[in-house]
Amino acid sequence: MIRSTVAHVDLAALQANFKAIREFLETRRTQQGSPSVPGARALSGPPNPTRIIAVVKANAYGHGAERVALALEAVGADLLACADIEEAVVLRRAGVRAPILIFGALSVSDLDGLFEFALTPTISSPAAARAVQAAAAKHAKTIGYHLKIDTGMNRLGFRHDNLRRTLSDVLASSHLRLEAIFTHFATADEPETPFFDLQRTNFEAALKTIDAMSVGPAKAGPHILRHAANSAATLRDSRVWYDMVRPGLLLYGIVPPPLASTIRLTPVMSLTSRVVAVKGVRPGEGVGYGLRFEADKPVTTAVIPAGYADGIDLRVSGRCQVLIRGRRVPIVGAVSMDMMMVDVTGLEDVSPGDEVVIIGRQGSESWQQIDAREMAAAIGTIPYEIVCRIGSRIERQYAGTSQGDTEAQR
């Protein structure tokens, strides 16, 4: 049974966004050259090109991780990134063969999956290093890992100012091979704050410290790569591209607010539904739970089968709009679990079955568009939340991939 509310995912747009990001990086690299870190010779990976870690955690930001990962693999993503081992296993079972990095904390009970499914862990604490070392010894294998440095966000990672005390045993672990070092910015999307530059300084100092600790070739790969830039940092400052960047939101055609971008991107997802009922509301009557919308004149409403169980935020009422017949109409009344109502007064002949665009564009000649950034700004949140919250009962329908990229058609 097909529900009326559907998320349409354009894999060709996804692949085009990936290629546009790669072209942006290559063009800027050619113009500016590779940023260097004085004193970090052993940590400098190959200068060109900047590699891309495609972030597909959280079900590919709500877009459907299996199909998205296959599409990104087909156009040459160097690495895919998941939040945990469980997410990565889903991708492997879907046929994804590209290297997969686990960003988040590791569960000891899941560590066998690193070896069974050829995954790359992040090590962010001495305890994590000991656990992975023990698991690797049990499997009689050496495993490559990425080392996370906490440069001020105070979440996961080895503190940048305490590395000589905390890292020695990790770097000496016989079954662990250091492949990359990374950090994460707390304020990359806040251009007015100086903390971004402080974190960059802390990270580059940490790279020098680790270099001075003599990470030898027996414990490291041929190049110890560096990465720090998420989508916002990629747009903000080419000095933090280092050897790899980690676009997430940009891949899905959304620019992190309040930043702007010269990269030509296309939103990958649209969210549509259908009118299921049209109601006449008399003056003085209310609409929805709590009767929070009260008509002060004759009003016509349309009922849409999408509610908070589908990821529609309660705050959209009175703040956001949808598109019907190429026109914006406001959401009114409290959003229900399975439904919401919109005011279609003055819109002629609205009928059950009419298309409703919640996110996306509608119209031919004078088309209108509502995107995740607009919706997020209206309710005081971030576009990440808008797309990530689209519920599991909403079917994802996939459009094709770029010509020749048949792998992602599975």
Give residue spans per PLM region:
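Active-site anion/phosphate-binding pocket segments in diverse small-molecule metabolic enzymes
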Residues: 1-15, 19-23, 86-87, 106-108, ...
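Active-site-proximal beta-alpha core segment in soluble small-molecule metabolic enzymes
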Residues: 5-13, 23, 29, 47-214, ...
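A broad helix-preferring feature
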Residues: 17-18, 28-31
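General helical structural elements
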Residues: 32-33, 45, 152, 250, ...
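Short, low-complexity intrinsically disordered segments enriched in A/P/G/S/L with frequent Arg
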Residues: 32-36, 41-48, 220-222, 406-409
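Intrinsically disordered, low-complexity segments enriched in Ser/Pro/Gly/Ala and basic residues
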Residues: 33-35, 43, 172, 213, ...
